[in-house]
Amino acid sequence: MYKNYLQRTLVLLLCFILYFFTFPLGGKAYSLNNWNKPIKNSVTTKQWMSALPDTTNLAALSIPGTHDTMSYNGDITWTLTKPLAQTQTMSLYQQLEAGIRYIDIRAKDNLNIYHGPIFLNASLSGVLETITQFLKKNPKETIIMRLKDEQNSNDSFDYRIQPLINIYKDYFYTTPRTDTSNKIPTLKDVRGKILLLSENHTKKPLVINSRKFGMQFGAPNQVIQDDYNGPSVKTKFKEIVQTAYQASKADNKLFLNHISATSLTFTPRQYAAALNNKVEQFVLNLTSEKVRGLGILIMDFPEKQTIKNIIKNNKFN
């Protein structure tokens, strides 16, 4: 008991030290006027998918995303461990308006949202309400949502979320339960919809009333780079670049490329400061070379201009 108490005390002490000595995100400063200009003609970050052809496969896109999307607020534990717990500054709706189209949602059996053991002052019902309100206003967009069982429980997680998912069923991309093709949908298939990536104990897609909701997170039709546990910046950046190049050469798999990482001595904010601008410049270089389809780039603390430059890598009408 004393040992556990001592460990918790040391972690809290480290967090206080990091809180006072961690500097804000570095990098370039962008004016609001710069990032808020249309991407092309009248295309804005709120509706950027609307300017892409219906036939475009999701695997052929460059999609900005966020890691631990809801970790911009939380309870007292979140506040005390903020340097390690915080991964975002924008609210969910602000992220969607800024162009984020992949979100990382982690819930427990009580259907509240957590980052590990830390409650983020949010619920799954609130998340779904926010997403559907956005899709009502922007019906040609789609949101890819990883939904992780943060409790790693048994089948009860799927059982508990079914009534809530059923309320919003018209907003989810579904296929017949018997469909085993695992094909990546086109924009026409998913406009105005949520593509659910389920990460649960059963390791199977969510099924309600003989309809399959989205697909399993980590299924064979996906490639995931998520070296998050204390990599060097050099190693992490190399992995990001390699995964993006792989994505640009494949059109039958979703590439989930995490820019995020953390350790006890290097916080998510510090990794973001070291990596986000490097990744942005890399994307800009590939755009100028007409190398497209870089997959889903999943970030902590993304700047709005970084999000926009990832979007601009896509081939618009």
UniProtKB/Swiss-Prot annotation:
Lineage: Bacteria, Bacillati, Bacillota, Bacilli, Bacillales
Protein name (database record): 1-phosphatidylinositol phosphodiesterase
Enzyme Commission number(s) from the entry: 4.6.1.13
Record's subcellular location: Secreted; Cytoplasm
Residues spanning the signal sequence: 1-22
Keyword match Secreted: yes
UniProt-listed PANTHER family: PTHR13593, SI:DKEY-266F7.9
The PI-PLC X-box domain, residue ranges: 58-196
Family annotation (Pfam families): PI-PLC-X
Entry keywords, A to Z: Cytoplasm, Lipid degradation, Lipid metabolism, Lyase, Secreted, Signal, Virulence
Reaction equations catalysed: a 1,2-diacyl-sn-glycero-3-phospho-(1D-myo-inositol) = 1D-myo-inositol 1,2-cyclic phosphate + a 1,2-diacyl-sn-glycerol
Gene: plcA
Description of how the protein assembles with itself and partners: Monomer.
Active site residues according to the UniProt entry: 67 (proton acceptor), 115 (proton donor)
GO CC aspect terms: cytoplasm; extracellular region
Lyase recorded as keyword: yes
Gene Ontology MF terms in the entry: phosphatidylinositol diacylglycerol-lyase activity; phosphoric diester hydrolase activity
Gene source species: Listeria monocytogenes serovar 1/2a (strain ATCC BAA-679 / EGD-e)
